[in-house]
Amino acid sequence: MRALLLAFQLLSVVAALTTVNCRLDLSPRQISRKDLLRTHLRLYQVGNFSGQPYSAKATLRDPEGRFRFEDLPVSHDENSTVYFQLVASSQDYNLKPNRVLIEVQGRGEGKEPTVRAFQNVFGREHFPSPEILYPEQLVELEAEPELVISYVHAAPMRNYIVSRRSGILDSGPLAGIFRSKYKMAAVVTIIALLLFPMLVEKFDPATVEAIKEQRLSQTREKYAAVGESNS
């Protein structure tokens, strides 16, 4: 009989299971398959706990960006509070909030536990209470019916391969010419002046012959005028 009573008492305080519903909001953009693959969501238990700590990863469930963490261990005891840390990251966006402290408090037998969320900051991931002023009190977020995570702006481009030696087009005199539109215009003009006679001779030989005859006649007239002045 005592064994049955002890078992009943243990069942009254044993951990129940609850779910935290969340949503990733990228509006006005639509969530694509790329966002599904490049967004990482993790929830783990912090604070005082017994046994194996809870840890889980979630993925976006639909194009609306909904995701959830299931089977969170909580207690029926009214004085029992369990804390979890939600970490959200993306390879394409800076998410806000990217760290959320989730508080699950039991309300007694037959009642759903109360879920609260607080915007956490870097360096406070393992503080198990939002009331610790280090360095400031955490801001409470709306957790019902779902916790919403949005984005600040697109993340900067990540250079996974960095060239140690730059080429001649990245540094040096040639790079300076290519970066300046005025220098480029001067170079193109000089090249055009050098190539123009050859192009004309190739595509219009008659015009080239006429130009040569005109220059030759001008030279003859010049020498003829010089000879008359000497005589």
UniProtKB/Swiss-Prot annotation:
Residues annotated as transmembrane: 184-200
Annotated membrane topology: Single-pass type I membrane protein
Name of the protein this chain belongs to: Protein SOP4
Ranges of the Lumenal topological domain: 17-183
Organism: Eremothecium gossypii (strain ATCC 10895 / CBS 109.51 / FGSC 9923 / NRRL Y-1056) (Yeast)
Cytoplasmic compartment segments: 201-231
Pfam family, one: SOP4
Annotated GO biological process: protein transport
Annotated InterPro entries: Sop4
Signal sequence range: 1-16
Keywords: Endoplasmic reticulum, Glycoprotein, Membrane, Protein transport, Signal, Transmembrane, Transmembrane helix, Transport
Location within or outside the cell: Endoplasmic reticulum membrane
Record family assignment: Belongs to the SOP4 family.
Role played: Involved in the export of PMA1, possibly through the monitoring or assisting of PMA1 folding and acquisition of competence to enter vesicles.
Domain of life: Eukaryota
Cellular component terms (Gene Ontology): endoplasmic reticulum membrane
Main location, first listed in the record: endoplasmic reticulum
UniProt keyword ATP-binding present: no
Glycan attachment residues as annotated in the record: 48, 79
